[in-house]
Amino acid sequence: MPRNLVLFDLEWNIGYKPFTFNYHGVQQTLRGEIIEIGAVKIDEDANVLDTFSIHLRPRIFRSLQHHIAKVTGLTQEDLDKGEPILQGLRRFMKWCGPDAEFAEWGLDDVPVLKQNLFLCNLDESRPTVWYDLQQIFLREHPRKEGEGMKLESVVTRMGIPMERPFHDALSDTLYTCLLYT
């Protein structure tokens, strides 16, 4: 088990029109611009040592896409009041520390994090190691026919009390932490 394990979740906004950029000589489409980060540092027994939560103000996709608003419950005002994305990402990566290994439910968020770090001219070489906790969970709890793998479905299946809203980055991270234990 890594000494500095950070479980995290991102909520990201998408544009009404695609945004393409040159990423190390390759044209890429931005998958999403981060608008919320939730993270926990855990010890080897999966006890929560510290939490991190922040709303970010995007630079590229400034208008909150209606589907994202519906899913997350965030408003345009939440985005407008968020910490500027550059400062927020810098603060998050500093909180994680240089030796952090990341874990998430699925593998969607690390590529989005790396794209956003790059677009903010921040070091996107970290994390160098990250884990897909969904796959680790499946080894212990094989999926049955018709069972969904969305976080909410798995939390329900495992009988974990749903005391926090889903699609809130910190809440989703804390649910993931409960599944990890």
Model region roles, listed by residue range:
Residues 8, 131, 171:
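Active-site flanking residues adjacent to catalytic metal/cofactor-binding acidic residues
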Residues 180-181:
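Conserved small/polar residues in nucleotide/adenosyl-binding loops
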Residues 122, 143-156:
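A structural motif
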Residues 12-14, 135, 175:
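Short, glycine/acidic-enriched loop or turn micro-motifs at the edges of active sites
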Residues 2-111, 118, 152, 156-157:
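Conserved non-catalytic scaffold segment of RNase H-like nuclease domains
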Residues 131-146:
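Short alpha-helix plus adjacent loop in nuclease-associated cores
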Residues 169-176:
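Alpha-helical transmembrane segments that form the membrane-embedded catalytic/substrate-binding core
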Residues 117-127:
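A short alpha->loop->secondary-structure connector
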